[in-house]
Amino acid sequence: MTEKKYIVALDQGTTSSRAVVMDHDANIISVSQREFEQIYPKPGWVEHDPMEIWATQSSTLVEVLAKADISSDQIAAIGITNQRETTIVWEKETGKPIYNAIVWQCRRTAEICEHLKRDGLEDYIRSNTGLVLDPYFSGTKVKWILDHVEGSHERARRGELLFGTVDTWLIWKMTQGRVHVTDYTNASRTMLFNIHTLDWDDKMLEVLDIPREMLPEVRRSSEVYGQTNIGGKGGTRIPISGIAGDQQAALFGQLCVKEGMAKNTYGTGCFMLMNTGEKAVKSENGLLTTIACGPTGEVNYALEGAVFMAGASIQWLRDEMKLINDAYDSEYFATKVQNTNGVYVVPAFTGLGAPYWDPYARGAIFGLTRGVNANHIIRATLESIAYQTRDVLEAMQADSGIRLHALRVDGGAVANNFLMQFQSDILGTRVERPEVREVTALGAAYLAGLAVGFWQNLDELQEKAVIEREFRPGIETTERNYRYAGWKKAVKRAMAWEEHDE
């Protein structure tokens, strides 16, 4: 009998490194997770130690195989998914980082972005990289490291230094420095990559003074990049054959591989991505244009919108307002009332993200009357997550001209049946919740497995995409539009709160 084979997904996130073993039926066999230190040298600055990222990720790989009691020769392939935009520069000769990893959340390069704005580069960046000019992305982070570590510009030009996002760093370490690659999804988050020519953008490299010599080769999201012999019993060299940034991996894990398919991840905030097929749609409505994975890991495009406050607004109810003891309680209290009694909560605690991009908006509660109680406010806070999702979806439909027929959902808050039903009601579309909630790891596993023939094609995977529950709209169009109009009015009044009158 042939020995049973498995796929390992490495999921390198912002606060922890995880490894997940899956079998051919996409069942999760074992999981290992290790947290690592968040470094805050100054307000608004966020760093990670690249060696700690590597140590935690490599140890979870060993642990996850031991937990499942399988040897490395039973692993058909490894797939990698990662926190996007986080930037690492290291020495080619020694493999030592020349500075800590600058994390996607870090705002230290705001001044560099202001200079680029003054130089009139905003439109060029949006048109060619698909991104908005913001410290979020890798390009200005690389420049900052080269500007602040003595001698590094010259060393980079001599080919002595290498740059990579987290996927690139992990593969470099796993292959003992033999392979320096990234995939199209991660490259598209650097602000250095032209999403139309599918090559590094010479103008952006020149503007930021980043030598091409230090950049990784950009490859498809599903192919064999190299092999590793790290991890567990047995000495087999395991192919590394899938890479995707975390949100694109979730999109693929949800099998949103056709034009017009979309997923929303409900975490601290919300990330919604819609696959736009072979067409890069330039957003006129505050969204990002990014690269996603097609059916065999080839380049597709997507529109992406980020909402800042989703699960975080439930935490606010619990930690600051003390209205609930546990996030799970929110559903119970929300369903104790029939509606919000006219109340709208706009959770703009740190401003508003897509599609408004208003850093001066602030949180507000509107429509308070004498009959309003705590349950109404809890319900209105949950509803705000669904309203913000509709805001992003309306922008996506306006940009793409595509009408969404079903939204696939994942993340912690999807366990809340009230929220999922209201999401369906307010969108006027089906909401599909999958049985397997580990969709980010699943996406990386699928990409890796397809590359080595572990799964033959996407049709085989469609059978495994079991929808645990489907939510369908339960309110009339007039009621839906009336409620949404109230939300829009509330948002308008919360905007520009911090701005002072001239």
Swiss-Prot record:
Binding site residues for ADP: T14, R18, T268, G311, G412, N416
Binding site residues for sn-glycerol 3-phosphate: T14, R84, E85, Y136, D246
Regulation: Activity of this regulatory enzyme is affected by several metabolites. Allosterically and non-competitively inhibited by fructose 1,6-bisphosphate (FBP) and unphosphorylated phosphocarrier protein EIIA-Glc (III-Glc), an integral component of the bacterial phosphotransferase (PTS) system.
Listed InterPro entries: ATPase_NBD (IPR043129), Carb_kinase_FGGY (IPR000577), Carb_kinase_FGGY_CS (IPR018483), FGGY_C (IPR018485), FGGY_N (IPR018484), Glycerol_kin (IPR005999)
BP-aspect Gene Ontology terms: glycerol catabolic process; glycerol metabolic process; glycerol-3-phosphate metabolic process
Pathway the protein contributes to: Polyol metabolism; glycerol degradation via glycerol kinase pathway; sn-glycerol 3-phosphate from glycerol: step 1/1
Family label: Belongs to the FGGY kinase family.
A family per Pfam: FGGY_C
Organism for this UniProt entry: Shigella flexneri
Entry-linked NCBIfam families: glycerol_kin, PRK00047.1
Domain of life (superkingdom): Bacteria
PROSITE patterns: FGGY_KINASES_1, FGGY_KINASES_2
EC number: 2.7.1.30
Protein name: Glycerol kinase
